[in-house]
Amino acid sequence: MNLLSIQPLNRIAIQFGPLTVYWYGIIIGIGILLGLILATREGKKLQVPSNTFTDLVLYALPISILSARIYYVLFEWAYYKNHLNEIFAIWNGGIAIHGGLIGAIVTTIVFTKKRNISFWKLADIAAPSLILGQAIGRWGNFMNQEAHGGPVSRTFLESLRLPDIIINQMYINGSYYHPTFLYESIWNIIGFVTLLILRKGSLKRGEIFLSYLIWYSIGRFFVEGLRTDSLMLTSSLRMAQVMSISLIIISLLLMIYRRRKGLATTRYNELNNNALE
């Protein structure tokens, strides 16, 4: 293998004069669109008005992107304070999922209160869409050659039976790296299937969404330990791992609390439109 012949994939998908469209944005857009279609179809089965998720996305998407970028920039302020012109260059990557999740949850809480709809009902319906979108979105990191792990040998990557297109894209500045984007994407796809199975069971309202938070956080905690570009809370604490542990604990406590207080009595697929549950 002639290492000098390995060239990264072109991050630019389309270019019309000054207009540049990056694969990163296209891939994120595909994830959002598929998630919206999935949530809308499931919502119809549970008597949620057809325009509800479209309206929610129109509010939540820009706020989530903004909060995800702010979250990232704050933890990388040592760099961005000297590169202010790059703060809004999200096509180069650098949006934090946990920041986006915070923005999405806050927006959905406000949205459901104004529409007099159960937050937990919408969150449960959206949970598979969220994790599917995250699984797809990680391939944007692949195109940007970011969110990778530490150095490994080509032999190691070949032992994973990965196609050359992935192995070669993991060749960055003279070294091969762990394709952590792929590990997390696979974990999220398994989580997507798991959530589809769980929602056919006896879980109460809100518990599909909380299960999503737990599942995603478990995978993210371990994958984050392999990454080399983690946002750091301190010199030894990775912010994503702290957030993951926090979300697992909070989600478990919420499940227990809601059941004990009688706040979770409706099963996921019951046609109960009580906005308080």
Curated annotation (Swiss-Prot):
Positions that bind a 1,2-diacyl-sn-glycero-3-phospho-(1'-sn-glycerol): 138
Give a GO biological-process term.
Answer: lipoprotein biosynthetic process
Coiled coil location: none
Which enzyme type, at the first EC level? transferase
Q: Which GO terms describe its molecular function?
A: phosphatidylglycerol-prolipoprotein diacylglyceryl transferase activity
Membrane topology category = Multi-pass membrane protein
Subcellular location, record wording: Cell membrane
For this protein, the Enzyme Commission number is: 2.5.1.145
| Keywords linked to the UniProt accession | Cell membrane, Membrane, Plasmid, Transferase, Transmembrane, Transmembrane helix
Q: What's the domain of life for this entry?
A: Bacteria
Q: Which InterPro entries match?
A: Lgt
Kindly tell me the pathway this chain contributes to.
Protein modification; lipoprotein biosynthesis (diacylglyceryl transfer)
Regions crossing the membrane: 19-39, 56-76, 87-107, 117-137, 178-198, 206-226, 237-257
Assign the protein's first listed, main location to one coarse class: membrane
Answer yes or no on keyword ATP-binding. Answer: no
User: What is a single cellular component term in the Gene Ontology annotation?
Assistant: plasma membrane
- Sequence similarity: Belongs to the Lgt family.
Q: Which HAMAP family match?
A: Lgt
Functional summary from the UniProt entry? Catalyzes the transfer of the diacylglyceryl group from phosphatidylglycerol to the sulfhydryl group of the N-terminal cysteine of a prolipoprotein, the first step in the formation of mature lipoproteins.
Name by which UniProt lists this protein: Phosphatidylglycerol--prolipoprotein diacylglyceryl transferase 2
Species per Swiss-Prot/TrEMBL record = Bacillus cereus (strain ATCC 10987 / NRS 248)
